[in-house]
Amino acid sequence: MRVLMLGWEFPPHISGGLGTACLGITQGLTEKGVDLTFILPSMKEEEAGQSETKLRSASGVPISHALKKAVERVRHQQNYDEFSELLMRPVNARLHPYGYDYSQSVDANAFNSDDIAEISHFHGGYKDDLMDEVYRFSTAAAAVVLEENAKKKADVIHAHDWMTYPAATIASRLSGLPFVAHLHATEFDRCGDHGWDVIYGIERDGLHAADHVIAVSERTKRIAVERYGVPEHKVSVVYNGAFLNEDIPTFEIPEAIKNEKRVLFMARITFQKGPEYFVEAARLVLNEMPNTRFIMAGSGDLLPRMMKRVAELRMGSQFHFPGFMRGKEEVYRMYSMADLFVMPSVSEPFGIAPLEALQCGAPILISKQSGCAEVLPAALTVDYWDVRRMADRIMDCLNYPVMAQESLRQCQADLQLLTWGRAAEGILAAYSHVCPNA
């Protein structure tokens, strides 16, 4: 089976769980014998040779006039004409859902014609010009898909999250290949009911354009069905996995903090991850257990507000902000030094971080609003908004380490079932809905 996969990030350049999940998925599928090419906006030339996955960059790909016109026709049919206007200013309007069964073949030589209309370059990532990059990537990625499909016939296009849905939709319409959308997170997860209608529209259009949808949890499937109107039969649930064979180094805890209890939050410091609830729970814990150290590792738009709140509560000596952790060793060091890892997410589609914490031997306390709670029944859970209960749970774990260790032991046993190989089997089953003969 041959898969052309579209993604926005891939190790070593990641900003969160999406890149990690893409790595696990590609490794799992490759081990199952899948011929897979991963297409992303940009990468360094040397990275293509270092990765076990076949990587293709859409940066610098020539776009012929013929292909550009074909893409524009698809955009018109898919109501993407208004997308270009959204690049100039934020607007409060939904994109229309797809309402056409449209397919058009393109000459296999259209992508490499000498008559070049444009060449796009991308930096990737999530900068201020993200919408512009998403728009241009939809053309460049389509060119790469057509080229790869001409080299060797593919069976399916698999696209990760909203940034790649327009590209996958256009590539699918031009190539005739089925499109599977992988839903790792939604605008409702990221922003609650106050998200950007433009992104919601792109997500909704992409999920309706897809021939099949993969959701990372039952929670995410419910959102796809109830908030995006995706037919329930069109959505398969495939849980993420963990890198179980990875060697976890051991770390010495510095003498200066050996006698303290350490509670860790490590995530993007944004609305979705619930950092404010962690800060308020820390206040309640420190009132009763002042010999506790809280760590909030990560970066994000709420970081300044969290630092200000910690200062207002006069917790600076016991609450630390080490910043974004770069590299696996730094991440593993933080987990390994923690007596408890807390994930108080407001809405977490799955949550790979708790799996990593468990691998490093850290007990976990996760919100009931997280997808990974579905597959970790022994995990300690709390409603993200119940700060008093969260503080009590934290103190229970710190005061009764036997209880925390028993939860850890049971969670680590459940973790053995969460392999990327098992995830790959679920993805292959999802593919069978759209390409049964592959």
What are these regions (language model features)?
Residues 256-282:
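Conserved donor-binding/catalytic core segment of Leloir-type glycosyltransferases
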Residues 324, 332-338:
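Short alpha-helical donor nucleotide-sugar binding micro-motif in glycosyltransferases
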Residues 379-388, 396-401:
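Conserved acidic donor-binding segment of nucleotide-sugar-dependent glycosyltransferases
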Residues 346:
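Aromatic "clamp/platform" in nucleotide-sugar-dependent glycosyltransferases that forms part
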Residues 305-325:
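Nucleotide-activated donor-binding/catalytic signature segment of Leloir-type glycosyltransferases, i.e.
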Residues 37-151:
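A conserved catalytic-core segment of Leloir-type glycosyltransferases
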Residues 363-366:
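Short hydrophobic beta-strand element within catalytic cores of glycosyltransferases
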Residues 219, 241:
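Carbohydrate-associated surface elements
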